[in-house]
Amino acid sequence: MIKNTIVLVPFPFDDFSVTKVRPALCLTNEIGKYNHVIIAFISSKIPDDLIESDIIIKKQSENTIGTGLTVDSVIRLHKIVTIPKSLIKRKLGTVNKFIAIETRKKISQPFDNE
């Protein structure tokens, strides 16, 4: 089971010119015979203009325990991609129940924006 796991994956920059290994949150378990996983980008650069679907994880918060994240971070639920599980470099940790529930509540917000 991989859902709610924070992993390291090669993630493309906005212009797709280069990739960088970054943390991501697995939003699903493996899908289909090719074991694809839907992931959301995690950044340590917390923008001033957060959007409704962003989830902040503070380093000093109990929500950080077990995630493997070492700095304040933001889960960017509007930056999602489907990848083969084989691209996952390694597991960092797992989000707690609170973050998992927040993710489920906020995941549809980018699609509901009118």
Please state what every model-predicted region is.
Residues 17-20, 26-60:
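Compact nucleic-acid interaction/catalytic patches
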